[in-house]
Design a protein with these regions (language model features):
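Conserved ABC ATPase signature
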Residues: 115-125
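Helix-to-loop junction immediately C-terminal to a conserved catalytic motif
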Residues: 29
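Conserved ABC ATPase "signature" region
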Residues: 44-45, 86, 93-110
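Short coil-to-helix segment of the ABC ATPase nucleotide-binding domain corresponding to the Q-loop/switch region
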Residues: 75-83
Length: 203
């Protein structure tokens, strides 16, 4: 079985199309169930969870960051970040307070009322990260989070990920960028249905 260790950055890179990257992310993200084996997340055996339990785990313990941001175009940055809290049944006043803190955390305190069309690519990704962390997840899943960004914006996102990791958030990320992958504590390649892992020495 696989256990997701706390406070780790693991990067999946250079794996060919169809190798299972997305399937692995979906299983870790409690979107799909594995057909065999076990997944232990924060001490809980996910393979034994019902659909409702998996939904609760997604809301409470997992944040998702996508390459193309997946923001609602007609909603402000504040409203986009509030969405997970709305699904979790958090009262409106608390939702806005927590969303404001998350947006401040990613350096967008002055862009809360802006809609996605008024933001740069890097700013959109930071809104997406704020949305992912507003529920204080144990693990952050990021699928090519810098793939649609210029190098400067990509560096800013990775600095933010490093800061979150230092605070105890585990990060599982897919990337084809060797430089981005080198920042992780562990890299994994998936080939022919097998995972090949490499630990990165800490400095």
């Amino acid at each position: 079985h696989k256990a997701i260790r706390r406070q780790r950055q693991m990067c999946i890179r250079d794996s060919p199309s169809g190798s299972g990257k997305t399937t692995l992310m979906n299983i870790v993200g409690c979107l799909d169930q594995a057909t065999s084996g076990r997944l232990i997340l924060d001490g809980q055996d996910i393979s034994k969870c019902s659909d409702n339990q998996m939904s609760d785990i997604r809301l409470q313990k997992i944040g998702f960051v996508f390459q193309n941001f997946q923001l609602l175009a007609r909603q402000s940055a504040m409203e986009n970040v509030c969405l997970p809290l709305t699904y979790a049944g958090v009262p409106k006043k608390e939702r806005r307070e927590r969303a404001a803190i998350a947006l401040e955390r990613v350096g967008l305190g002055d862009r809360m009322s802006f809609k996605p069309t008024q933001l740069s690519g890097g700013q959109k990704q930071r809104v997406a990260i704020a949305r992912a962390i507003v529920n204080h997840p144990k693990i952050l899943l990021a699928d090519e989070p810098t793939g649609a960004l210029d190098s400067h914006s990509g560096e800013q996102v990775m600095e933010l990920f490093q800061s979150l990791n230092d605070e105890g958030v585990s990060i599982l990320m897919i990337t084809h960028d060797a430089e981005i992958a080198s920042m992780a504590q562990r890299t994994v390649e998936i080939r022919d249905g097998m995972m090949k892992s490499k630990e990165v020495a800490e400095t």
